[in-house]
Amino acid sequence: VDAVAALGADVVVDYTSQDFVETVKRATDGKGVDVILDVIGGEYLDRNVACIAVRGRIVQVGVMGGGNTAFNLGALMPKRASLTGTVLRARPLEEKIALSQRFSSEIIPLFESGLLRPVIDRRYPFTAIAEAHAFMGANGNIGKIVIDIAG
């Protein structure tokens, strides 16, 4: 939580000990958020619907919490919100190429200028890859784990 706040987040939620729906409602004066980018899915969908604003968008980009779920469609409809699922893998090669080129032309310059910067938790030499893997498996990282390859 402290690390995320230090990166500049206006509102931080520890989902293991706080109800993120209540936190979002309180932080937005009950209006909800405009966009939710969800990599978990599963049981989070109902809570995401509770957090979304009128005309908001939920973009499902992963299903780490499970791909099958039941949710209250009746809660989504009055908000006139949309739920979009997307993955890169299922897209045609031409579309993947176009997206990669757009990323290179629009996003990479933001990293090069310093406007965006990756959050790196730790760096490991290639010879310590097993240690890096164990660290990742412990789920204690905040940000990316980088493996340096001498070359």
Residue ranges and their predicted role:
Residues 124-132, 145-151:
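A short, charged, Gly/Pro-tolerant segment at domain boundaries
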Residues 13, 34-38, 61-62, 96, ...:
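Glycine- and other small-residue-rich loops at beta-strand/loop junctions that grip anionic moieties
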Residues 1-47:
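Adenosine-nucleotide cofactor-binding segment
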Residues 43-116, 141, 148-151:
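Glycine-rich phosphate-binding loop and adjacent beta-alpha segment
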